Structure formats: C-alpha cells, structure tokens
C-alpha cells in the first residue's frame, strides 16, 4: 500500500485525506493518506524521514511550499515558475520530483464551470503564493491578467516576472473602477481574518466571481460581500482543491479520478 500525507501547520482542517481516500476507493487503488503537522524548525528533517521510511509522495500546504520546493531534485515547469510546490513524488532512484498542481486545479475547475474564454480579462486579488501558483497555467491558457495587491510594488514585481509568458499587468486600487473584467479571482488570505477586498459593485456584478477559499454553502467573506453588492455568478475554491488533488493523484498513481462525484460528496459532507 503506497503511503502519502499532506504536510502543513495548521493541518487539522485539511480535506485532503478525505479526498484522496475517496479517490483511492473510486479508482481501486490501495493507498494510505494522512495529515501530518509540520514543525517550523524541523520540517525538512521531518519530510526527509517520511520519505526515508518508504513514503511515495506528499502534498505540501502553508507555510511550507517554498521550503519543500528547495528540497526537490527535479521540477515541473509550473512548479519552477511558482517557486513553490504543493506536490512531491519520490522516484524509483530516490530523487524527489516537485510539481505545483494548484494552477491546473484552478483551470480545470473554471472549465468545469464553463467560465474560460479565449483572452478573457482576469483580475486577481493578491500577489502571494496562491497567485504565483496559478499565473503560469492561466497565461498558458492565453488569459489577460491584472494583479491587484495592497502592496503595489509586490504586484508590479510579480507581473514583471511573468510578462514573458503572456499579457499581465498590475493595477492600483484607484485604477480598478475604470476597468472591466470577465473574471475576478480572490487569491488573498484576508478571509481567514473575516475580511476581504471591497471592490466596487460595478466590477462584481459584471464578472464571474471566484474565491480560492471555500466554506459550507460558499459563505466565504469575499463571496458574501460580492453577493451583497449584487453579484450573481460566483463560486468558491472547493472545486479547485478537489481538482488539484486529482492531478496530484494522477502523478502518483497514474490514473486521473473523476472529480465531479467526489466534489459533490465533499460538499455534502461540509454542509451537513
């Protein structure tokens, strides 16, 4: 039985063990997948020991994605561009292969929703690790991206770094009301403090709204604010979570699970 785990701190809230257990049942793959609390001082040693004991792979979540990236030997292109990994696979020769499936998870969920269009205008809120993880796949899909971040220099720096891959720019908050977007993605962590970026109502009512965070009945702070401003097309990030997990599972077990029934089951379990 192949051994896997998700590492983070905190980690008790993670849905990943449940998702991967359901993937294993659906595909007939015998796996073990558990949550592991990473130690701020000992994370590298913990991860090395985990693989030394025979584990086949690991998911990495906050705050360890950059540190796990540094431990790998080989990288996918999306992982290299994000400079952070959410997935590690131990190869037969013992080397660690790093991938970042967040971007493909987002792109696949947008496709599931029927939202992607060629050259659509996307506003991404935030310039942290969550944004870095999805920019390369979005630009590969020929999307036009604007990044807004409270620290303008950080957004400008990120836009400059990814400019070689497609159309991307940064914008100050005062510039946003003058623009129009087809899709607005919240990639900030403000929701963890019960806050959100309060965009003008005109932007929220004219675009599809996507929050990378998720909650029962899609009641994240950002989506609740968007609804209060008249937004009618919105979705939380649960589908992205299940989607990225599916591509991780494929990397490990060579079979891509069917996301839809697992997403439906996880959503039902969250709401009851």
UniProtKB/Swiss-Prot annotation:
Entry keywords, A to Z: Amino-acid biosynthesis, Aromatic amino acid biosynthesis, NADP, Oxidoreductase
Keyword DNA repair part of the UniProt annotation: no
Statement: the UniProt record of this protein carries the keyword NADP: yes
Enzyme Commission number: 1.1.1.25
Catalytic activity entry: shikimate + NADP(+) = 3-dehydroshikimate + NADPH + H(+)
InterPro entries hit by this protein: Aminoacid_DH-like_N_sf (IPR046346), NAD(P)-bd_dom_sf (IPR036291), SDH_C (IPR041121), Shikimate_DH (IPR011342), Shikimate_DH-bd_N (IPR013708), Shikimate_DH_fam (IPR022893), Shikm_DH/Glu-tRNA_Rdtase (IPR006151)
Superkingdom, natural source: Bacteria
GO CC terms: cytosol
Involved pathway(s): Metabolic intermediate biosynthesis; chorismate biosynthesis; chorismate from D-erythrose 4-phosphate and phosphoenolpyruvate: step 4/7
Record: active site: 65 (proton acceptor)
GO biological process: amino acid biosynthetic process; aromatic amino acid family biosynthetic process; chorismate biosynthetic process; shikimate metabolic process
Residues reported in the UniProt entry to bind shikimate: 14-16, 61, 86, 102, 214
Entry's family note: Belongs to the shikimate dehydrogenase family.
Function noted in UniProt: Involved in the biosynthesis of the chorismate, which leads to the biosynthesis of aromatic amino acids. Catalyzes the reversible NADPH linked reduction of 3-dehydroshikimate (DHSA) to yield shikimate (SA).
Subunit relationships: Homodimer.
PANTHER family with a match to the protein in the record: BIFUNCTIONAL 3-DEHYDROQUINATE DEHYDRATASE_SHIKIMATE DEHYDROGENASE, CHLOROPLASTIC, SHIKIMATE DEHYDROGENASE
Protein's name according to its UniProt entry: Shikimate dehydrogenase (NADP(+))
Gene name of this polypeptide: aroE
